[in-house]
């Protein structure tokens, strides 16, 4: 019997492609969102699914030149300035009067920065709200328990 070394090869993951799921006539962006919805519903906790979009940074007119390659890094430098920059927006998965839930299995590359910006927004404009970010079904169940405990204390 020979000893073989097993190498852990970390494969590069591609973009997140979660499957849309329908429940109660609502189309959810992922199975985890559906799971959270069902868990909230069973606990009789009311929350709107993608009920509100927040503008984290207003759009603006960029008047300078800005020479950049395409986002894929190929091609030659092209002036991508002198145009309107769109606002940065964020739509949480579930929102209620006292909590906001963002279910996130695997985050895309822009999410961590958007989440930090949203936390700052909440800190300044919605200090009464508690944020939850479950990443699996077990954490969704824990979020429901935490919400119920917090509401009983009031």
Feature names for model-found ranges:
Residues 1-154:
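Electrostatic, structured charged patches in enzyme active sites and in nucleic-acid/phosphate-binding
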């Amino acid at each position: 019997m020979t000893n073989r070394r097993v190498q852990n090869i970390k494969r590069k993951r591609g973009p997140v492609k979660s499957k849309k799921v329908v429940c109660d006539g609502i189309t959810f962006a992922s199975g985890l969102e559906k799971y959270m919805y069902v868990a909230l519903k069973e606990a009789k906790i009311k929350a709107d699914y993608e009920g509100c979009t927040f503008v984290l940074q207003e759009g603006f007119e960029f008047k300078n030149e800005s020479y950049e390659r395409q986002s894929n890094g190929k091609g030659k430098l092209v002036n991508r300035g002198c145009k309107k920059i769109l606002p940065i927006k964020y739509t949480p998965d579930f929102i209620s009067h006292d909590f906001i839930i963002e279910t996130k299995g695997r985050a895309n590359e822009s999410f961590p920065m958007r989440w930090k910006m949203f936390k700052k927004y909440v800190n300044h404009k919605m200090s009464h709200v508690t944020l939850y970010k479950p990443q699996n079904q077990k954490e969704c169940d824990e979020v429901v328990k935490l919400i119920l405990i917090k509401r009983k204390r009031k």
